[in-house]
């Protein structure tokens, strides 16, 4: 393996790990216990890292005049594969799906609680306020239900 490809592989691995750990669903989780590692999260990390690989080649070309066609092509192909994996949810099992849905519901709780506490629109519109409170309650209930299903 040549130096440039080894370097790109290290960059890709770092970007993949950052993509998984700093995924918005994880950052916005209401509780740390609502964060699970799932295939969908891995697919998202692959999507982020592969897009960074090919877009890095474009930036590198614009700023320095160098372009590696092979790395660009591999990045594009990995992006296409990751889109396919995300859209089809290939290999995602019942438990994998539940793990991702818990994070999704937890994000809804975080954003709803924040908007309810800081936003006059929610408190001045009784319909919207009721909807938000119901959503908060239902998401909590569904998270408990899904966590029980995982056990």
Predicted segment positions?
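His/Met- and acidic-residue-enriched segments that coordinate or traffic transition-metal cofactors
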Residues: 1-151
């Amino acid at each position: 393996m040549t130096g440039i490809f080894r370097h790109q592989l290290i960059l890709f691995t770092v970007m993949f790990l950052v993509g998984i750990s700093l995924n918005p669903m994880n950052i916005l989780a209401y509780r740390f216990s609502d964060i699970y590692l799932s295939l969908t999260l891995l697919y998202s990390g692959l999507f982020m890292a592969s897009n960074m690989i090919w877009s890095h080649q474009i930036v590198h070309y614009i700023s320095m005049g160098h372009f590696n066609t092979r790395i660009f092509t591999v990045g594009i192909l990995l992006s296409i594969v990751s889109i396919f994996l995300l859209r089809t949810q290939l290999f995602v099992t019942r438990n994998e799906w539940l793990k991702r849905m818990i994070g999704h519901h937890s994000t809804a709780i975080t954003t709803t609680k924040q908007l309810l506490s800081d936003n006059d629109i929610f408190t001045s519109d009784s319909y919207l306020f009721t909807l938000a409170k119901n959503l908060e309650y239902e998401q909590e209930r569904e998270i408990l239900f899904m966590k029980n299903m995982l056990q």
